[in-house]
Amino acid sequence: MKRDLRSQNHEPLNCAEKSDIPYLIVYIFEPKLIQHHDTSLRHLQFIYNSIIELNKILNKKERFVDVFYGEAKNVFQFLMNEFEVKNVFSYQESGIQISWERDRLISKMFQRKGVSWKEFQRDGIIRGIKNRDQWRKKWHQIMRSPIVFNDYSVSKQVELNHPFKLPAELKTKLEDYPMEYQPAGEFNAW
């Protein structure tokens, strides 16, 4: 999971489900991104509480988002040591330079390990383009693409014991979500 924390109209989750192999749903709180000046506690709280709300939906199908705290490279190296990872499905990141550099590093690692990483576009941002030629046409294609209706099979997701737990102090801060903030979760979207 990257920025889109919904159970519906989620193309990467749809592809994972249709791949007909067991899969994990992972969200990584990355220290480098957390420490970046663009990141606020309020944003992190919204993400964390959106994951809690998403898990309420996924739990009905015995699935959940497994939360990790660590750099993506280390988390994926751990996962590849624990499992035979064949595919990774995610949305294309549209964030800051650090996330761009991270994704290039992860892409190279996946290529070396023979892992197919399919990134889906979720908005009008196209990473790495040299110019805006054809941008309008591509934007319209994405905006006109059909809505994805996710359907999840009941499948007991592996509860993985991993060393990437949220630090207790951070977890406490994330759980302390002020009532006056917009409620988290896809059913509370404005």
Task: Specify the residue positions occupied by each region the protein language model found.
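Trp/Phe/Arg-rich N-terminal binding region typifying the photolyase-homology
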Residues: 1-154
